[in-house]
Amino acid sequence: MPSHTFNPQAGYDLAVDRNLGLGEIFYNRAQKSHQAIAVCDGGAVLTYGQLHAKAYRLAQELSQWLRLTEKPVGIVVQHGMADVVAQMAVIYAGGSCAPMDPTLPDNQIQGRLKRLDAVCVLTDQANRHRDLGADVLCIDDFDIADLAPEDTLYPVATNLEHCAYLIHTSGTTAEPKAVQIAARSILHVAFYAPLEPVYDTDVVAHANNSSFDVSLFDIWVPLLRGAQIAVINKAVLLDPPMMAREIDRLGITVMATTTAVLNLAAFIYPKAFAKLRLVTIGGEAANVAAIRIILKNGPPAMLFNAYGPTECCVFCLAHQITPADVEHGSIGVSIGKPVGRTITYIAGDEGGESDQGELWIGGPGVSPGYFRQPEKNLAAFSDLGEAMTSLENPVRFYRTGDIVRRRPNGALEYVGRRDHQVKVRGFRIELEAVEAGLLKTGLFSDAVAMRIEMPQNGAGSILAAYVVPTDVSKPPTMDEALESAKSILPHYMVPQLELVPRLPLNRHLKVDRKQLAELFGRRWEDVSPAQPENASQDVRSALVSLWATVLASPLSTYGDDDDFLHLGGTSLQAAMLINQIRHKFDIEVSLLTLYDNTTLGALTSIIKQRLSGQSETLHNEKDSWVADSEIADDLSCPLDRPIDWCRDTEGRVFLTGGTGFVGAFLLADLLHMPQTSQVRCLVRATDAAVGQERLRAALDKYGLWEDGFADKLVAIAGLLEDDYLGMGREQFEEAASWASVVFHLGARVNYAQPYSLHRASNTLGTRNMVRFACAGRTKAIHYVSSIGCFGPTGSILGTTSVREDEPLLPHITALPYDHGYAQSQWVADALLRRLMDRGFPIAIYRPGFIVGHSQTGACNPDDFLSRLIDACREIGCYPQLPNQRKEFVPVDYVNAAILHIAASPASLGHAYHIVPPTRAVSIDMDNSMALVDRAGNSPMRPVSYKEWVERLAATSPKRLLPLQPMLAERVKDGLTRWELYENMPVYETTNTARALQNYPGGLQFPVLDTSLMKRYLDFLEAKG
C-alpha cells in the first residue's frame, strides 16, 4: 500500500475536466513512469517507455488504413503481451479496438470483421496466415526501437467520448452484437475499481480473454494508474495450485476473475488467492459454499462480488464480501451497490420505481450503443424521460433485462432474467438464435423455432422448429438438415425439425406460431407406431427410434451403454417410453423394469425375453427393506431427556420438507406460533439464497406468505442423503446444538419410481435426521409418514384393523404390490419404530391422503388426487372402486393435530393415525368422485376400472400420463396396484384421540362435502 492516500473522486473529476483520450492519458503516465515495468509476460518485460515506443511504431503502420478516428481495427493475437501492445497501438492511432477470440473459427471472425467494416486486422505470427477476410498487419514484422521519436503525431488526440472498443456479446440473434465502449467508461473503471482503488504499487493479473470486457480492467486500470500488468494464461488459471505459485512469483496483488475460477479454486486449492490484496469475481451468481471455503482458508485481503453487463463496461455494481454474507442461514451474497458515478433504477411491473423489478443502469459506464444497430439501441438504451426528472442533466440508461430486489441496506439482489428466452431441459435458449442458426445452414429460406409442450407423447417441453427448404422441389434429408444444424448450433439448441413448403400467417401477416404449435401436436397424435415385420430381430433399431421420439432428440443412434435417465429422461418420459414399448411390441413390461434396465442394451434384452415368452416376475425386495430398516441400529440412544421445545427460552425448530405441500402449511403454522423463535429449514438448493426463494415461493403458492415471516425463517441449503445433511460437519454440529426440536417431513415422492430411487432421500435421509436429533442437545424428532406404509394389507393379508403402535413387519408381505414410495415409507417407519422401542425420543404421524385447506381451499395441484380429478373430468368418467377409501384429511386438520400432539413431551414413543375420526365421515372413492361431479358441474359417469384404464390409454390426459403404466400394470390376480387397495382396514386412532382430548375447544374434523369440494375445485381452476 502506498504511503499517500488516493481520492478517486478528485482524480476522476480532474481527468474528466481535461477530457483527454486514453492514448494521451497513457502517454502522460509513460512520461512520468518511463522506466517502470508496464507488462510482464513470462520472461519478457516491457517498461512504460517501451510500451509507448511499440505502440507508436505500430500506430505509424496503421495510419495508412486509419484516415479517420474511430475506425474499427480487428485484433487477433494470442493472450499476453502482444494483445496489450496491439490494443495500445490502435488507441494511439485513433482507431477502435475490435479484439477477437483467436480460438474462434475463421468464418466467425470474418463475419464479425465484415459487419464492423474493419479497416484491417492486427495479428501475431501464430495467426498471420489465417483466412480472416481483411488486410493483415502482423505485429511481429516490425523491429521496434525502445524509444519513439519525440513528436506529437501519436497518440492521436481524441477525447473521452472516443469509441475505444467494440466488444462482442451474445444477443437475441445468432449474430453477436458489437457493444461500443467509450473512453469515459474505461476511465470510470480505472478510478473506481470497483470500490477499492488500484495503486501504482500494485501488480494486476491479466487473466481474461481480450474479447471479453473484463480484460479492460486487466489492461487499462493498471496502465492508467501506473501499476504493472502480469500475464496469466488460461492453463495456469485452471490449475489453482499453479496459479497460486504464479501469483507469488509475479507478485500479483490485484485480480479480476470469474465466479467459476473461484469455485474451482475453493474445492481444489482454497489458499490460491491468499496473497492477493484485491480479488473481484463476477459473471454468474456467487457460490456461497465456495466463498465460505475461501474465506476460511486464506482469503485475499478484500474480495468483491461485482456485476456489470458489457453494455455498462466491466463493473457497475459491487459488494465487498464478508463472512456474514456466507454464514449458514444468510440470504446470500448481493450484487452490491452502484460503483462510482453509476446510477440504478428499478422499474416495477406497474410502472414507476420499485424495490423489485427490472434493473436499469445509468452513468459514465453506459455504452453509446450497439454498433450500427439503431433499432436495438432504441430498445436497450434510454434517458427514462419523466422517471428521471430529479436529475440535473439527462443520463443515458441501459435496460439490463435482469430482475433485482433491493435489500433494506440498499444493496441489490439478483433475482432472474426477463427477455425473450425459453427453458428447455434445463437450458436457457433464445429462439431467434436457433432460427438464425438454421438459416445459416443455407438449406432453409425461413425458420420458426418454438418451445412446445408435448401432452401427447409425454416428452415434456421440447425445442422444435418449422423450416421451409430453400429448394422446395429438392428438400434436404433429415440427416443432412440435422448434421448441418449441429455444425452451427450447440447441441442443446438443435431442434426437432419439421419441413413445410411455407409458414402460415395470421391476420396481422405475421407467422402464426399458435397454428404451428397445434399442427405439431396433431402430427404427434397421428403417429401410430407400426409393429416391425420381425420384432424379435429388429428390437434394437425399433427401440432406438422410440428413444429418439420420447427424448425429443434429433439423435439417430444410441450406444448399448447409453442410459435413458442420463440422457435426460424424466419420469414423464419414462412413462411414455413404457407405453410406446407396450404398443410397439405387444408385450407387458413394467415401469419398474425400465428403472432397473435403463441402458439401451439392457432394455433391448428385456424386450427380447418378453417376446420369447418369458413373463415378468414381481419385484420383491423384502430382504433389502428389512435390512435397511436396521441401518440406524448402531446409533446410541441419548441418555438425556429431550428438550421441551415450547419452553420460553427455546422454540428453535429444525424443519425438513418446507417446500412441499404439507410442509409449507406446517411451516406457516410454526411461524405463527408465539412459542417459535426461529425456524431453520433444510432445503435442496445450491445455496441459502436460493433455498430462501424456494421457501417463499412455496408459501406464496398457497397464499401463506407474510412479510413478518422473514424475521423468523432461515433456509439452509442441504441434502437429506448426506451424512451431515449437506451442511458440512461444522454447520451440522452447530445446528444440532442450536435446535430445540426436529420436524421431519422431507422426502422424495414419486409413485412411478422404484424403492431404489427413493432410498437415498427417504431411508438414508431418515437415519441422518435421527443422527442430527441425537447430536448436540437431545431433541425430539417428529416424523410425518402416512398410512401408506402398511401397503394394501387389507387385500393381501385380510387385515381388518391396524393399531397405531403395532409392529410393521407383518405388513411387509403387502408391500411388493405397492409403489416404491410406499415401500420407502415402510422402511423409514420401521427404522424409527425400532429406535422408539429402544427409548429414542420419536413420534410418528401417519395421516391419510392429505387434501386442501378446509377454509381457503388451497390444495396441491400436483398431487395424485388433483391429477386424477383433472383426467377424469377431461375424459368424462371415473373408475368404480368399491370399498376403497383414501382417508381424506384436510391439511389444516392434520397440522393442527400434529402441532398439538408434538407440544406435549408425553407424545413421544408413539405413532398417531391422523384420519377421519369415525367411519361415518370417511368418504370412499366412489362418493368422492361423485362429489367432484356435483361440485364441478362436469358430467362424469362411473365405469369399470378396466374401461377407465382403456379410456386413459386412448386419450392420454397429460396430468396422469406419468402414472399411466403404474395404473394399468396388473401385479396380482389380474388386479392393479390401485385395485388392491380395496377392502382397506380401519386405521385405529386410540393414541390420536387421547392426545387430542385437551385440544382447546376440541379439534373439529372438516367433512368432505360438496361445498368443500367446490372450494378445492375453485382453487385448482384459479391455478390453471
From Swiss-Prot:
InterPro entries listed in its UniProt record: ACP-like_sf, AMP-bd_C_sf, AMP-dep_synth/lig_dom, ANL_N_sf, Far_NAD-bd, NAD(P)-bd_dom_sf, PP-bd_ACP, Thioester_reductase-like_dom
Annotated keywords: Ligase, Multifunctional enzyme, Oxidoreductase, Phosphopantetheine, Phosphoprotein
PROSITE patterns in the cross-refs: CARRIER
Report whether Nucleus shows up as a keyword of the record.
no
Q: Does the keyword S-adenosyl-L-methionine apply?
A: no
Which residues are annotated with the PTM O-(pantetheine 4'-phosphoryl)serine?
S571
Q: Where is the Thioester reductase (TE) domain?
A: 655-898
Q: Which Pfam families match?
A: AMP-binding, NAD_binding_4, PP-binding
Needed cofactors: pantetheine 4'-phosphate
User: Where are the stretches annotated Adenylation (A) domain?
Assistant: 29-425
Known pathway: Secondary metabolite biosynthesis
Entry's EC annotation: 1.2.1.101
Give start and end of each Carrier domain.
Answer: 534-611
**Catalysis performed (reactions):** L-tyrosinal + AMP + diphosphate + NADP(+) = L-tyrosine + ATP + NADPH + H(+)
**Alphabetized PANTHER family for the sequence:** BETA-ALANINE-ACTIVATING ENZYME, CARRIER DOMAIN-CONTAINING PROTEIN
- Please provide the record's free-text comment about the domains of this protein: NRP synthetases are composed of discrete domains (adenylation (A), thiolation (T) or peptidyl carrier protein (PCP) and condensation (C) domains) which when grouped together are referred to as a single module. Each module is responsible for the recognition (via the A domain) and incorporation of a single amino acid into the growing peptide product. Thus, an NRP synthetase is generally composed of one or more modules and can terminate in a thioesterase domain (TE) that releases the newly synthesized peptide from the enzyme.
General function of this protein: Non-canonical nonribosomal peptide synthetase; part of the gene cluster that mediates the biosynthesis of the alkaloid (-)-FR901483, a potent immunosuppressant that shows efficacy in animal models and a probable inhibitor of purine nucleotide biosynthesis by targeting phosphoribosylpyrophosphate amidotransferase (PPAT). Within the pathway, FrzA catalyzes the reduction of L-tyrosine via its C-terminal reductase domain to produce L-tyrosinal. The biosynthesis of (-)-FR901483 starts with the condensation of two L-tyrosines to yield (S,S)-dityrosyl-piperazine.
* Similarity section: Belongs to the NRP synthetase family.
Protein name per the record = Non-canonical nonribosomal peptide synthetase FrzA
Question: What's the source species for this entry?
Answer: Cladobotryum sp
| Lineage, uppermost ranks | Eukaryota, Fungi, Dikarya, Ascomycota, Pezizomycotina
